[in-house]
A protein has these predicted regions:
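Structural preference for long, well-ordered alpha-helical segments in enzyme cores
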Residues: 1-4, 47, 51, 145, ...
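Conserved coupling/interface region of RecA-like P-loop/ASCE motor cores
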Residues: 1-29
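C-terminal accessory regions
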Residues: 118-178
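Short glycine-/polar-rich loops that comprise or flank the Walker A/P-loop
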Residues: 29-30, 90, 104-107, 156-159
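Helicase-associated low-complexity regulatory tails and linkers flanking the ATPase motor
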Residues: 9-14, 54, 58, 178
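Conserved helicase/translocase motor-coupling segment
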Residues: 36-117
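Switch/connector loops and helix/strand junctions flanking conserved nucleotide-binding motifs
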Residues: 1, 79-81, 103-104, 117-122, ...
């Protein structure tokens, strides 16, 4: 929860909120473990091993969560690639981060960057000209990227692993927490 709040701290336009965990922390629980330098094509075998290990961890712990491991990405393509290599008997559900809103699992594994989109001068000008928005288009997209990171992080009940090529956006904020 605290890692999710750390990501939300970077959102410029938001309603402040704090969360309370509803379960006590158990040995082995942790917030987000960031794995940088990850390339899906080269790192797929190790990722499959990690997912399998997390399924075994959840089985040992006799969790009451209906889903052992939730595999998340912003896009469907990486999810399909990973699922094609996973043992179908493993208790893993794969969703885009948007579709996973409201779901949870004992362990969440995120494969994504959640980086904001590139600057867009025309949309910034339209936002400013319309008078409807307090912020620029670029700021709105950066905020949305961080909110999406928050949603992904808070899907994991006891553990979260985030695999990304480079720390940027939400993962960059997490890499600074020390």
């Amino acid at each position: 929860i605290r890692d999710g709040e750390a990501v939300l701290a970077g959102v410029q336009f938001k309603q402040a909120k704090t969360s309370q965990p509803c379960k006590p922390t158990q040995p082995g629980d942790h917030g987000v473990k960031l794995v940088t330098g990850f390339d899906l094509n080269k790192g797929l075998p190790k990722l499959i091993e990690a997912i399998t290990a997390q399924c075994a961890h959840v089985a040992e712990r006799q969790s009451r969560e209906r889903t052992a491991v939730l595999l998340l990405s912003r896009r469907n393509e990486p999810l399909r690639t990973i699922q094609a290599q996973l043992d179908r008997k493993l208790p893993v559900k794969a969703y885009t981060i948007h579709r996973a809103k409201g779901l949870q699992a004992e362990v969440a594994i995120i494969v994504d960057d959640c980086a904001p989109v590139q600057p867009h001068p025309l949309r910034n000008a339209l936002y400013a000209y319309s008078g409807f928005f307090r912020n620029s288009y670029d700021q709105a997209m950066a905020d949305e990227s961080l909110r999406l990171g928050y949603v992904a992080i808070t899907r994991g009940v006891s553990r979260v692993f985030w695999y990304t090529r480079k720390a940027q956006g939400a993962t960059e904020r997490l890499s600074r927490r020390g």
